[in-house]
């Protein structure tokens, strides 16, 4: 297999998907949200309790259901934007499901409440990005035109502006 084919496969499998993931993550501020999660991952205990695992799994059922929701194909959202958002949802599902079990119950409760609010906010934002329907711009049809040109003097730019709604061009005649 040639080096060009290997490079093409690497780009298709890894580079472009991670580039899109980074663009979406940077645009919604995920690096600042996940900063505390990565600290918790590095300090995570290797033997968490079974109840903690059950709580973590039940907390992210909503996340997996958001990822698997079928959307209307005609909603006007860019395919690559949907792909990147789904990748972000998938990555966040793993990042949010790993956190450090704590010994103090009050600290554990406060961190769980604050992180669950942030996680829910991020997931709702991503879901909104995924299923939103952008409204197309409405053309302005009723533009008053001054009839300064007579029938004998035909001006192409005024006709194009009047017929096709172009607003650029000479403003003295419009």
Curated annotation (Swiss-Prot):
Residues 1-35 form the signal peptide. Its main location: cytoplasm. Disulfide bonds: none annotated. Coiled coil: none annotated. GO terms for molecular function: translation regulator activity. It comes from the Bacteria. InterPro entries: SecM. Keywords: Cytoplasm, Periplasm, Signal. It is found in: Cytoplasm, Cytosol; Periplasm. One of its GO terms (cellular component) is periplasmic space. Belongs to the SecM family. HAMAP family: SecM (MF_01332). Regulates secA expression by translational coupling of the secM secA operon. Translational pausing at a specific Pro residue 5 residues before the end of the protein may allow disruption of a mRNA repressor helix that normally suppresses secA translation initiation. This is Secretion monitor. The gene is secM.
